[in-house]
């Protein structure tokens, strides 16, 4: 972004400077070549929860835009949604898991008594299923009782991971839209359903009103060319994509996959890829409805029987008759190309999905492992278990290695038991876990301890995610994980020991979205912003600088506190940022302005990442950029946030020669004049810098005045009563 330009996190606008890059990445191996063509985007600042919709005469739309059009509410006749629009959505289904009870408490706390549509809601218990404490069992019982009392579909602990159930049981269907209060809702895109994460407050709003708000992200098109070599899987593809395009190319985008390479991908591989588009930084990962997907649903229909309420002949015939496809000429912000034929078994880490190596390369480094994991909504499906079983057949897990296996659902486990794969894994020395999330979220048996190295077929390897912060975690396919468990170190499966290491090529060429630019150019943002009663016209304080990019939600609010529903505001304030900097609490005070780097708040959907900051008395966070989920949590919980990359760069320059501090009191002061839409920063030597930013409109202000989305919903309910 050009110096001095910025935008408000609730708005997407300002010109993104043209970028042409030709580079090589020596660390990126396995003969992969990648091309990306990135379009220059211009968005106009829209300050409220609604904006003017595209008024063109049937403009070409992407698959994402078409699905949103189908589920958007109160759109004027003959108006077509597009990327950048704020819309009110009424998703077909909304899933929540162990956080269902906090959602229920929010729901009841806002004065709601009966859910708007009990056929819209799904409750599953999957995260902490190994925890048999009285408190957890009581919470699980509360969730079950609430669901049954409201007539909500409920799946108990042991039935499986919610995302897998959503797919198995047809809550996520082609051409539909489903959301969940979990960051891996992207998974549903593997079956052509637009899946995107929401947070707990959004879920409570949907329970009460059937609706919430969403801004359609910029949309990226990923062309998968070539055929995937035999022995590789979707995990190798998504790990490779995360490593090849590791400069936030698709951050906060909706992704659509297409290309000849789709024919070589099973539906389970597509689900794996869609699942980990979350770690790639995207808000959704959507595959098209094609013949392979329709054939998969025919098999599901045979398995489930003719009378299933969602997967039935009538539904499938309707999908076949009118599949939702992208229009010719639909605009995509980015075009990425990946040649599948050049891939080999891939490994990400340690402790980052952006660090890539081929398994063959790491094998030469003799990286000994202590634990291996085949679990999660990423790779706990039947084909994953089969790949691992084939790899370990007739062999034994290495001495000193613990190999944990858990199916994504009870249906998957039963099928693996029936075909013998489950017993094969047990015979090799694997330790089985109940169907659920477990070690992937850092809960239950088998967590990584200080100094240990683990390799996992899960989706997230943030430091401390799967146990100790002093452990190292790598991610890979089930075949690589199983082979490594047998070898006692990270290795490539048989047949890939001599994978050739070549340099990838990346070519980025920006384009201009003329359709958006022409619309945007007619809309001015120079007028003063009206301030509603109760909203401050000035927000000011001293800047505290946490100089880190990709500061994730585990760093802001540790996962071990996420499911403690009884934690107080004061306790939240004490643990805020402790995984990032244990000194944060001592260095900050009420009314400070927190400034951090780029992609702030990446990671899980836990809204405590926002509420913990508020608990410390910090009213405003400024970042180079924000994770979209954190942006939602900010809006929904009345934490102010401004995206101002130029300020971040100026702070980095100013303190470049000083000793490193994770949390720095700068002596700089920031003042946001909401009425004039300006931010002024005064340095410690009284130099001033100012930026014009986008307006914060009355609709968003009203959320803050009501204390967030929850308060707004409560107000709406009281009006209807």
UniProtKB/Swiss-Prot annotation:
UniProt KW ATP-binding keyword: no
InterPro entries: Acnase/IPM_dHydase_lsu_aba_1/3 (IPR015931), Acoase/IPM_deHydtase_lsu_aba (IPR001030), Aconitase/3IPM_dehydase_swvl (IPR015928), Aconitase_4Fe-4S_BS (IPR018136), Aconitase_4Fe-4S_dom (IPR036008), AconitaseA/IPMdHydase_ssu_swvl (IPR000573), Homoaconitase_mito (IPR004418), Homoaconitase_swivel (IPR039386)
Catalytic activity: (2R,3S)-homoisocitrate = cis-homoaconitate + H2O
Positions contributing to [4Fe-4S] cluster binding: 377, 437, 440
Record GO cellular component, one term: mitochondrial matrix
CC cofactor note: Binds 1 [4Fe-4S] cluster per subunit.
Co-factor requirement: [4Fe-4S] cluster
UniProt-listed Enzyme Commission number(s): 4.2.1.36
Keywords from the named record: Amino-acid biosynthesis, Iron, Iron-sulfur, Lyase, Lysine biosynthesis, Metal-binding, Mitochondrion, Transit peptide
Biological or metabolic pathway of the protein: Amino-acid biosynthesis; L-lysine biosynthesis via AAA pathway; L-alpha-aminoadipate from 2-oxoglutarate: step 3/5
One Pfam entry name: Aconitase_C
Primary location: mitochondrion
Enzyme class: lyase
Signal peptide residue numbers: none
Gene Ontology terms, MF aspect: 4 iron, 4 sulfur cluster binding; homoaconitate hydratase activity; metal ion binding
Subcellular location(s) per record: Mitochondrion
GO BP annotation list: lysine biosynthetic process; lysine biosynthetic process via aminoadipic acid
Function: Catalyzes the reversible hydration of cis-homoaconitate to (2R,3S)-homoisocitrate, a step in the alpha-aminoadipate pathway for lysine biosynthesis.
Family: Belongs to the aconitase/IPM isomerase family.
Protein name: Homoaconitase, mitochondrial
Protein source organism: Schizosaccharomyces pombe (strain 972 / ATCC 24843)
């Amino acid at each position: 972004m050009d110096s001095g330009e910025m935008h408000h996190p609730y708005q997407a606008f300002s010109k993104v400077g043209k970028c042409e890059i030709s580079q090589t990445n020596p660390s990126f191996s396995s003969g992969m070549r990648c091309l990306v063509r990135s379009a220059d985007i211009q968005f106009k600042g829209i300050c409220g929860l609604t904006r003017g919709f595209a008024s063109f005469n049937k403009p070409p739309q992407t698959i994402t835009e078409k699905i949103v059009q189908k589920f958007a509410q109160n759109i004027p006749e003959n108006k077509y949604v597009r990327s950048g629009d704020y819309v009110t959505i009424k998703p077909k289904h909304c899933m929540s898991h162990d956080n269902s009870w906090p959602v229920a408490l929010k729901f009841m706390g806002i004065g709601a008594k009966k859910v708007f549509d009990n056929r819209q809601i799904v409750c599953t218990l999957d995260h902490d299923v190994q925890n048999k404490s009285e408190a957890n069992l009581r919470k699980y019982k509360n969730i079950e009782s609430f669901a049954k009392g409201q007539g909500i579909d409920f799946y108990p602990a042991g039935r499986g991971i919610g995302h897998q159930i959503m797919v198995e049981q047809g809550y996520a269907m082609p051409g539909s839209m489903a959301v969940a209060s979990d960051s891996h809702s992207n998974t549903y895109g593997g079956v052509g359903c637009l899946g995107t994460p929401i947070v707990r407050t959004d879920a409570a709003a949907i329970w009460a009103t059937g609706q919430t708000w969403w801004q359609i992200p910029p949309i990226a098109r990923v062309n998968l060319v070539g055929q995937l070599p035999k022995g590789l899987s979707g995990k190798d593809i998504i790990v490779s994509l995360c490593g090849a395009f590791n400069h936030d190319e698709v951050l906060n985008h909706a992704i659509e996959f297409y290309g000849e390479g789709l024919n070589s991908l099973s539906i389970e591989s597509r689900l794996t890829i869609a699942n980990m588009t979350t770690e790639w930084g995207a808000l959704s990962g959507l595959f098209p409805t094609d013949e392979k997907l329709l054939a998969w649903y025919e098999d599901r229909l045979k398995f489930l029987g003719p009378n299933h309420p969602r997967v039935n002949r009538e539904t499938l015939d309707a999908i076949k008759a009118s599949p939702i496809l992208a229009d010719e000429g639909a605009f995509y912000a980015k075009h990425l190309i990946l040649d599948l034929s050049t891939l080999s078994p891939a490994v990400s880490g340690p402790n980052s999905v952006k660090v890539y190596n081929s398994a063959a390369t790491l094998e030469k480094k003799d990286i000994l492992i202590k634990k291996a994991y085949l679990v999660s909504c990423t790779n706990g499906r039947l084909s994953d278990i089969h790949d691992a079983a084939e790899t370990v057949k007739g062999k034994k897990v290495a001495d000193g290695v613990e190999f944990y296996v858990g199916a994504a659902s009870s249906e998957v486990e039963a099928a693996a038991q029936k075909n013998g794969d489950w017993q094969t894994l047990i015979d090799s020395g694997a330790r089985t876990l109940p169907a659920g999330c477990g070690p992937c979220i850092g809960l239950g048996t088998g967590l990584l301890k200080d100094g240990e190295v683990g390799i996992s077929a899960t989706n997230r390897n943030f430091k401390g995610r799967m146990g100790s912060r002093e452990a190292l975690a790598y991610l890979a396919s089930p075949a690589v994980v199983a082979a490594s468990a047998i070898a006692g170190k990270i290795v490539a499966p048989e047949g890939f020991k001599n994978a050739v290491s070549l340099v990838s090529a990346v070519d980025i060429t920006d384009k201009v979205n003329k359709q958006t630019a022409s619309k945007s150019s007619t809309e001015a943002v120079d007028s003063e912003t009206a301030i509603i009663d109760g909203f401050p016209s000035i927000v000011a304080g001293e800047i505290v600088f946490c100089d880190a990019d990709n500061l994730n939600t585990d760093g802001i609010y540790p996962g071990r506190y996420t499911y403690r529903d009884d934690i107080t505001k004061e306790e939240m304030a004490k643990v805020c940022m402790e995984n990032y900097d244990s000194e944060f609490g001592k260095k900050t005070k009420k009314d400070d302005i927190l400034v951090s780097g780029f992609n702030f708040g990446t990671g899980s959907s836990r809204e405590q990442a926002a509420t913990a900051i508020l608990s410390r008395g910090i009213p405003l966070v400024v970042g180079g950029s924000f994770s979209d989920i954190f942006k939602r949590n900010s809006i929904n919980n009345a934490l102010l946030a401004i995206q101002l990359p130029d300020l971040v760069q100026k702070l980095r320059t100013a303190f470049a020669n000083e000793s490193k501090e994770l949390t720095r009191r700068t002596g700089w002061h920031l003042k946001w004049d909401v009425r004039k839409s300006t931010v002024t920063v005064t340095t410690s030597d009284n130099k001033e810098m100012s930026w014009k930013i986008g307006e914060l409109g009355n609709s968003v202000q009203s959320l803050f005045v009501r204390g967030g989305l929850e308060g707004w919903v409560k107000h709406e309910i009281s009006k209807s009563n």
